[in-house]
Amino acid sequence: MSLTQARKQEIFEAYQIHPTDTGSADVQVAVLSERISRLSQHLQQNKKDFASRTGLLRLIGQRKRLLAYILKQDRDRYKALIERLGIRG
């Protein structure tokens, strides 16, 4: 369920704003989206894993707050990010 260091590095390189960026809101949202995707797959196979379901809801809330922050800062960057990640219909 957790991300490997190599996969995190791929996400950092794909979404970073500058070469040493690992903590911007865009990168954090991308990492959270990957974790949410993996956890959703786990929960489809393990329907009674309620602890993981709680963790999933926590991750979704965190991503929602970060996306609200990005929207408040720069609407164009927000639209580009959600389109690139394939979230929000």
Curated annotation (Swiss-Prot):
Signal sequence interval, chain numbering: none
Q: Which is one GO molecular function term here?
A: structural constituent of ribosome
Where along the sequence do coiled-coil regions lie?
none
| rRNA-binding as UniProt keyword | yes
Q: What's one Pfam family here? A: Ribosomal_S15
- GO BP annotation list: translation
**What does the sequence similarity comment in the record state about its family?**
Belongs to the universal ribosomal protein uS15 family.
Q: What assembly does the database describe for this protein?
A: Part of the 30S ribosomal subunit. Forms a bridge to the 50S subunit in the 70S ribosome, contacting the 23S rRNA.
- Please identify the protein, giving its name as recorded: Small ribosomal subunit protein uS15
* Organism encoding this protein: Synechococcus elongatus (strain ATCC 33912 / PCC 7942 / FACHB-805) (Anacystis nidulans R2)
